[in-house]
């Protein structure tokens, strides 16, 4: 069918000449149809059949390229133009032309015609002001039918306009032997058509007379024959255009010096590689100057270099410009009396070129390929891709990767053709192409897969051999579905149950899209694949195919999976604009996003200075904002993000804008003066720093004057690129002051300080080095040596300064240069008692002179007589200690950034204006107190402020200042403190560990430590986790955690799955780096797990879900479907069912018989026992007569009456309370899954980020203690039961009845609807949370019936109803209560009460090996247990939720409910009176116990 569709596509109409095949090809169509049928065998290969055409031939790549491409052309109106183009292919291609992107209809065009070689011929070019049909961009298009199309580079045809003179020649004069210029500037297109005439005769050009590219005429070494009338003529196809005539007069040599003057300065220009550049430089003057050129401080050789030629007048011509020719060129003219110089910048641009061209590619359908294209050029070229002549628009399947490469995903047959990479910049464009051939699936790729094939798509390219093919993979499921990735798992095919040597290919496509993609497993036997880079909320169709050495097998049934939707976030804000409003402010405007996905709450405006990586943000509620306080003339980038209730949306594109320029805010730098001779001084300087220029420097203003106060100031302006100036015409032996200021278009900035220099008395000789200084004297002190000298005796040689060298034993260790006027210098910071060698040399521009040597030994520390150079004291005269100076005051620390603090202070010893006029200096010291042993750091300053840098972020420092003047120093000032600003964390959280939670394989616990370089208070953490470590970070799942926590639980993970975890810390400044990925594999499912979130398969009941048993789990199957071929016998299954039902029926019958027997026996002795034992009917079960009955233990019943005090206790015998112990996890039935799931959801919504077992900050840092169950065994003669409820921390053995909890709004207990016994245990934790009790409440149908102890009840209600003890607590108890309470749960409707009690003495016994263990005294262990009571132990003064206790024996639910109803209706008035009497007696006993 594919061949038939291909043949049908060839049958096109004759009107479409681009797609019609030649007649011989039409004759082959029947043959193509026959040959095309086996092509369906490729499709059959996917369905499990062996290949049908393995030996099919492979098509070869077709040579198809341009021999000649059009180039940019300049033409004039009315002329003819040929745009060359020629392409090679077999068969010959069809050539067409495009103009400005539209095909030209050459058949009906009279002026344009296609030449046989493919070139375009345009006759009689038309061009006018309003009609320019021929000017534009032309492109040649070559097409080979049934093969493809390629396009040439784009060529620009420019038609010159009407000639217009912007400047014309003017009358001038020139001395014989000098130079002259005559201007003639026209529009740039017509410069090649300019010629000159002298006296109406064509002017012949030679080495002495040249025409510059601008049209200007330069005449050098003028002669008398050069005089006359000159005019320039423009001939551009129409009538010639003449300029004005100008007369050039040639004057005789005046025999006097004429100052050098620039007739034409060099100007900066831009050229393209391969072109010629002419840098003009014409200087006139007498004597005639000699012009030389320099580049980057190197003299250019214009004599022997073939590319560098010096033209007439001194102009420099550079032929065949290369990128290395770019730079700054200096033109220097010198005539022996004067030197002038000028400079210009040459910028070289490079057309696009290819470092790596696309390569031809073979591929199969559904594969992914990449065409590589690496380009170069200046400016950096942009790249676009063209397929068969049409521009490729990036989409989901055509993507631009690595800036220039084209990636095609999920190839289809129609993707075949020619692909071209087109690179373009301001100075040109270029193209390079490659061919893509898509082979049938049964045709192997003939060569090794090139690097442009993705690694996941080349595994099935080897030719298949004969043999059985695998069947379809089984049980293909999506085990993990996210917004942008899906994880698929499957089982081996039935034909190969082991499948160790099978590889798998996953074919997938977006629903409704025919383009299919493929992803292969990474190794044989692997049965899972994660498909990345999917679209959110999109349906994808997946099919899995197994492959063995014989080929591809059957495909699995299509699996339809929809990715998760992303949160509905706002789209980008449209029409963002930014414009500068002042040198320090920029206004940004935007509009409401088109897809806001709800109400936009606010916007966040991000901006960043260009060249930095620190982005700042501002919250904005409107659609515009003006940012102030920006740097002047600085480029900033801006972007806007809209926020709705879901969070931040899509960011806009960055827009860049520069603040307006301003006058410079700082003076030029490094001002220096060089005295050339007796009448000139050269000034050198550097521009202000880039941050203070505030705009483009357009020039410099030089002001100078004589040192005398009343002298006039002279100003000189120079260009912005000039950094030195020669000032001439000065007086001999006179001191001058100079200062320089920078200029922008906005004005003049601040000037430098005045700098002085004195001209020489006479013009001295500087053709040789100075002579040796006439004398050298040294004066050693303790840590310094004073050096003095006299100048050389020969005063006729220029001395520009002195070089002092010194060192211990050698004078070459250090060198200091001083001014030529200086006669002494103090070398400081020397070592005491050390031998120093000192040398002194005079120097000038030629070099250094002969050195003069001297040596000296510094004085020891004990010698304090540091004598001034000009004051002679006795060598041993003691010098008194100097008076200390006053310390600086008002020390302040101003925080500037995270690592910089400015220290300022005042000096009371200075005048009021605080101006330093002497040699004092200040020492600043600083340190931080963390750690405590930190040493001080010091720095010296000569001003009243100092900038301390290199500090640590978010750190408190203390600063103090000391002043020193000569030998006098002050004490340290009072300290000032300053804390640096915070900075984003610069290190990730450390010690990241992941462990599985015990008993909950779906829950893991992540632990970590704070970053070592937090740089501020950590406000939170973000935990990232994913099953793919290579996934993009935005595809990872995130879990936010508050900053004071160092552990977090993650629940509901997939079993037996590797997860990768990363953690990122944040503070107020932003997010820090991520930690390295930590891998953790969740455990496999365990059938003994009874956790609500990880049940075994056999315990999944109604409302529960099956667990994830991992990708390797194979469920048992019956009969022939069993993977191992071992069928299960139906007889065994039926027998097992009969046994289970029989055991259940027998158990129920036994329980009912025992309950009836106990009820009847209790009824016959009820009244007698009550009168004899004075005991209320309760949950205690007694065996024996009255003498065995224990005294009252306050577990009593009453009816709507409050307790009254008791005077005494009727029986001093001790009472013990015991609690049964479940010995293993099977003794307690787990809670119902559906109930736990619901409660779990409510808990999560209530607790926020805390997990179900999270503890308080203090409790969470210490280990958990095992839970305990504690009975009471009273030892003293007057026993007291101390009972108080305490909350347990999520023990899996704790189960609470939903109806056994007291309502928070009531202070009385009420009857449960189903009074079942409840098992509990005690925890030593001090945390209480009522929500935990609710969370652990099971349903009534899952409560166990204990079989550990069974007895008959001796004390019953009048109707014989058996009751159980329950324990509850009121949440309205007085918060100031300081004693524990024993809460009583009656079996008939009487109110509960609380009595103060004292905890029992005696240490308990504790066995940590059991899940929950009773604490019994030795006496209680030896005593036969007659009764079981329930109680909870807790901490004094705290209110805890109730913890019910399991009673060993319990009736069925229905029977117990009936007994309770009978019990409630069996009370008569006389019995109530008797009961009240008992109650009053017990109150008296209670008073006696508590007061004893």
Swiss-Prot record:
Indicate the segments forming the Fibronectin type-III domain, all copies: 472-566, 572-662, 667-762, 772-862, 887-986, 988-1085
Q: Would you tell me the protein name for this molecule?
A: Neogenin
CDD domains, from UniProt? FN3, Ig, IgI_1_Neogenin_like, IgI_4_Neogenin_like
Task: Report the GO terms under cellular component.
Answer: cell surface; glutamatergic synapse; Golgi apparatus; growth cone; intracellular vesicle; membrane; nucleoplasm; plasma membrane
InterPro entries per record:
FN3_dom, FN3_sf, Ig-like_dom, Ig-like_dom_sf, Ig-like_fold, Ig_I-set, Ig_sub, Ig_sub2
Where are stretches of biased composition, namely Polar residues? 1118-1128, 1222-1237, 1321-1353, 1361-1380
| Reported tissue expression | Widely expressed.
Q: Which organism is it from?
A: Mus musculus
Specify the glycosylation sites in chain numbering. Answer: 84, 221, 337, 501, 520, 670, 746, 940
In the record, Phosphothreonine modifications are located at 1229, 1435
Q: What is the lineage of its organism?
A: Eukaryota, Metazoa, Chordata, Craniata, Vertebrata
Which residues are on the Cytoplasmic side of the membrane?
Answer: 1158-1492
